Amino acid sequence: MMPFAVTTQGAQQPAPAPKQFGISSPISLAAPKDTDRELTQKLIETLQPFGVFEEEEELQRRILILQKLNNLVKEWIREISESRNLPQAVIENVGGKIFTFGSYRLGVHTKGADIDALCVAPRHVDRNDFFTSFYDKLKLQEEVKDLRAVEEAFVPVIKLCFDGIEIDILFARLALQTIPEDLDLRDDSLLKNLDIRCIRSLNGCRVTDEILHLVPNIDSFRLTLRAIKLWAKCHNIYSNILGFLGGVSWAMLVARTCQLYPNAIASTLVRKFFLVFSEWEWPNPVLLKEPEERNLNLPVWDPRVNPSDRYHLMPIITPAYPQQNSTYNVSVSTRMVMIEEFKQGLAITHEILLNKAEWSKLFEAPSFFQKYKHYIVLLASAPTEKQHLEWVGLVESKIRILVGSLEKNEFITLAHVNPQSFPAPKETADKEEFRTMWVIGLVLKKPENSEILSIDLTYDIQSFTDTVYRQAINSKMFEMDMKIAAMHLRRKELHQLLPNHVLQKKETHLTESVRLTAVTDSSLLLSIDSENSMTAPSPTGTMKTGPLTGNPQGRNSPALAVMAASVTNIQFPDVSLQHVNPIESSGIALSESIPQIPSQPTISPPPKPTMTRVVSSTHLVNHPSRPSGNTATNIPNPILGV
């Protein structure tokens, strides 16, 4: 028999079909040109001063630290096995291993970045062992500093600093007698008979490994992702907790771009990234592979089955089972901000392609404090550094709830929270207090037939503070003098709280005063001498000085955690998000079509509920809107925890 197929003379063999990455055919298979290579080299040179590449010496140090940690895990598991009288043959091969995930596993970590790690143990080692005997073993290591266990977290973790490198270690116990060296965590069968905490702990590694297996060229993917992550951080849209995207979500968007342009290199992929996602028809989901059902009865993202999934505005679905939406925190405002940034990025990268701009322009930070005319400033304060660290973490995790509430106001088009926090000026120089601020930019909508806009935000701010205080008390975190403050400032007044180098523009204006007067237990009257207002009562506070103004404040709200912030008599500003049409600004026509997901129904965003406001041009009365038929509903008292 002939070893090869016989063909007719002169006949041409059909070209082998290119491998398809992802759920659709690629948009382009074009190979890189010399100009693409030159632009990629320039991109690398531009990235270097930003510290996105780690020195070889530092990389080797990380590898050595992980080897030491891996040896500690093996030694610890062997000791546990011996204490439980396992057969010697099992003890000799019991194994155990440290896996990494996140930016380090993806190969895009920056200088000084921490390492996300997972300790995988066999079935006879449980979570209690991890948080007791392994914790004690780490405590004995002279290289280990700042060791702390967070057992009650959604994903329990041990945090430490190993020889100067911060490491977060999760734990997963597999239903295996031994842990082999070549264990592939992408194997879905490993999830059988695991508790939900182990499944959550495994998820990071499984998603990271799956992403790396789904991109055509890992080197091009990594360089593109480094550029996009830096761009997102420079443009203040890198924060999962505040409703933007986190590292894994950015990685999946870049991976999808790589799938659509499998032969492209970084300079092209960065530009195509902005092209694809500035035109993406949200809320159609971004998928790296077809979702698969494994019959393990684990909850997965599926808007056909789960009604809550239909309300996700910008779904980016993890490729590993059980599939989840990594962007469930995205709000109307954060999506608007990101889409506009995508359009800006497309316009800039086209200028770079035409040699009209350098790569450095892409990484120029926009002037957040010159972009809007109205801002809400949130301030969290605590008397000690340790309390402040916990308090700030809780407040920050709830800011997106406030943003969502502000978005429902008919006169607020957009509420843009800056992910960067700032130290706040001290209330008094001789008082020890730790304070952090966040700033939310507002785009306001002009009312019909009026040049004056009055908005009462009392209920929105009060609901936000109630939520924060209630969770702090229920989790036993709350301490006396933990406070939240809020105030409205115009752009010209930001200098009162922020230094000039942050504002990037020096302005001088008169300070205006604010008075807060509690009228009754069921209403709150704000007498305002300016267009600013703020309060910051602690849920346990009696009469004490306000954190910013020194004005008296007291425990007068039925919720004990009332904070009123309002904007009144605002002249409508000529401010809005800058809309950039990348086609008009670049003078090109987009001929590429962005593939949409077949078989996936378009999900309509939820309708905006109407909010009633009681507003006066001189004062605001706190009558929170309530559902009809529930006029007697009371806000729970956070002190009593009811």
Curated annotation (Swiss-Prot):
Subcellular location: Cytoplasm; Nucleus
InterPro entries, A to Z: NT_sf, NuclTrfase_I-like_C, PolA_pol_cen_dom, PolA_pol_NTPase, PolA_pol_RNA-bd_dom
Cofactor(s) listed in the protein's UniProt record: Mg(2+); Mn(2+)
GO molecular function, one term: RNA binding
Top-level taxon: Eukaryota
Binding site residues for ATP: F101, G102, S103, T110, D114, I115, D116, D168, K229, Y238, G247, V248
Family according to the record: Belongs to the poly(A) polymerase family.
Listed GO CC annotations: cytoplasm; endoplasmic reticulum; nucleus
Tissue expression notes: Testis specific.
Protein name according to UniProt: Poly(A) polymerase beta
Stretches that traverse the bilayer: none
Chain sites annotated for binding Mg(2+) 2: D114, D116, D168
Cofactor, how bound (note): Binds 2 magnesium ions. Also active with manganese.
Residues noted as binding Mg(2+) 1 in the record, renumbered to the chain: D114, D116
Keywords of the record: ATP-binding, Cytoplasm, Magnesium, Manganese, Metal-binding, mRNA processing, Nucleotide-binding, Nucleus, RNA-binding, Transferase
Record site: Interaction with RNA: F154, K159, N329, R400
Reactions catalysed according to its record: RNA(n) + ATP = RNA(n)-3'-adenine ribonucleotide + diphosphate
Disulfide cysteine pairs (residue numbers): none
Any GO BP: RNA 3'-end processing
Principal subcellular localisation of the protein: cytoplasm
EC number(s) given by UniProt: 2.7.7.19
